[in-house]
Amino acid sequence: MVPMWQGLLGVCVRAIRGHTPPRLWGRELVVTHLSTAACRSAPEQQDTAVKQQDQQDEGTKHENTETLELPTVLQAATAKNSYINAFKGLHTLSDMVSSKQVDFKKDVEGDEQFEKMIAVIDQSVIRCSPTTSLGALRSLLNLGVDSNSHVVQSVQMQLLWQLRKMSFPSLISVLTLHIDHQHTDLQKRVLKECIESIERRWVEMRGAGEMEKLYTCHTHFSSEFLGRLDDRVMELADTMTYPQLAKLLCALGTIKRRATPVIRALAFHMAKQTDRLSPKQLGNVLFAVNLLSFPDPVLLEKIASDLMPQVEEINNPKLVGSILFCLGHMRWRHPGLLEVLSEWTEKRASDCPLANLSALVLTLASAGYEPSNGDTLFPLITSRLNPSSFTKKTAWLDVVWSLTVLGRVSSEQIESVLHPSFVSSIPLIEQHLRLGVRLKLLNINAAAQLLLHSYSGPQLNLAEFKDVIITAGQDERKVSQHVMKMLHNLLPPPKYIYEGIQTSIGVYVDAEFATDKNGKPLPVQDFGEGLMSKSGEYVGTKSSGSTVTKKLPEGVNRVALFVWNYSDFAVGSQELTGINKLGVELLRKKGYKLVQIPYFEYNMKGKALRNVQYLEGKIKESLVV
C-alpha cells in the first residue's frame, strides 16, 4: 500500500504539471475513478474549484443513488484509504438515508466499513476547506451520527477555526445548520461565534438569498444588526430580480417584521417589474402582504394584472383557496380578479373542495362584491354546502352570514343557525369568537325579519343579547367624535340626538336623530328610544313608568348617521365592505333615512363653519333619497 503522504505528494506534483483536479459537484466530491489513490489539492485550489463548480452546476442534484447498493458504496468509500472517496461515500450515504433507501441505525451504524470510512474522515478533516467541512458536517448530522461523537466534534472544531476566513455565504450556511443542532456546548459555541462574525461583517451582505436567510434567523440577531440588514435590502433592492424581491417580502411576512421603509422599497421595485411571477409565487406574495397588513395599492394592482391571465391555468384548488383567503382577509375588492376566480370556481364547482367554495363565499361577502355569474354560481355552491359539511359550527355560521350579506341566503339556512339548539351552543365556543358569533346572529336575525319576508322559522330572544357591545378603534373614535362635536351645533344633545348606539340588529350607529320633512331637527326623545331600544321598536314611556311602542308620526323622519373610516371600505375602492353594506340595508328596511360621512369627504382640519355646513347639507340630501 502506498503511504498517505506519498499519495498526497503525487497529487500535488500532477497538479503542478497541469493535471485536472478532482471535480466538485455541490457538496459532493465526484471522482472519476474511485479506485485511484488520489488526494485533495491545496485548500486554495479547492476553494476556487468549489466556487467555479457551484456557479456552473447550481441546482445540480447528487448522482442517482437508486441503483447503488450499500456494500458497494461502503467498499468504494474505503478504497485505498482515500479521504476523497470517504467524503464522497459520506455524501452518498446521506442521500440514501434521505431518500429512505437505507436505515442508518439498522443498516449502517456499527458496520465495519462505515467505521473505517469515519476514521479516514476524522483523520483528514484538518486539511479540509470550509466548504468541505460544512458539507461533511451536514451529511454526518443528516445521517444521525451522534453530535458528541469524535468525528462530529472534529469537524465542528475545524469549522470554528475557519470562521474568520470563511466566505460570507458559508457563514450563513454554518448559521442555518447550527440553529437546528444545539445539542452540545461546542455546537452552541460555533453558533455564537458565527453570529458574532456575521454581525461584524455585515457590510459583506450582497445576495438576496443571503438576506432572506438572515431574516428567517432574525431571533438570533441584535436589533442593531437587523436595522443594518434593512438598510442593505433598501440599498440593493433596485439590483434585484422580481423573484428575489418577492422572496424577501415573503421572508418579512413569515417573521411578521413590519419594517415599513423596507416593505415600501420592495413594493415599489416589484410594481415596476415588467415580467410576471407564477401563480404560486403571487399567492405567496399575497399571503405576505396580508400578514404584514400592507395593502399597497400599486403592488396589489401589479399582483392582480399578473395573476388574472394565469388563473385559468391553475390546477391546484388549494392555491386558489389560499388566494381567496388573502383577498377576503384583506377586504380587497378587485372586480377583475374576483370575476376570474368566480368563473374558475363555477367551472370546477363539482370537484372543488368545500373549503374553496366557502372561501369564495366569505371573500365575496367581505369585499361586498356580487360576481356577474352569481345566478349560476351560487346555486352550485349552496347545493354542496350544508351544516353537516362543517365540523365547526362557527364555519357554517360564517357561510350563512356571508350568504346573507350577498342576498343569497335561504330560509332553511337561516333557520339552521337561529334554531335554539344552535344558539344554545354559543357558550361552548372559544371566548375570543363569541362576540363575532353573536353579532352575526343578530345580523341574520334582522335580515330574516326585514329582508326575507317568507321566513317563518325561529328568531332570537333579544333579551339574551343585550350585553353585545361593538367597540371602535382609537382612530375611528377620533373621527366620529369630531363629527359629533360639529353636529352638536345643529343637534344639541341629549334632547335632539342619541349617540353611540348599540342596536338590536348587530350594527353600530354613530348617531340617531329626528327631523321634519324640511330637515328641521325635532326632539328625538319625543318619539321613543328608536334604535336605543334593544327590542328594536320605537319605545316610549308612560307616566306610570311602563313602556309603550309608539308609531312614528307622519312627516317625521328618523335619521341614522354613520361615520365611515378607512377600515370600513374595501381595499382598492370607495365601496363599503360587505358587513357595512348589510348594516345600511337593514337600517333602510327599518325605515331610516341615512346620513353617511366617509373619511375621504370629511376634513377634520377644516374650519368648523365649513364642517357644520357640510353636515347640514348631508342631512338634507338624505331626506330626498
Residue ranges and their predicted role:
Residues 2-625:
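Eukaryotic RNA-binding helical-repeat scaffolds
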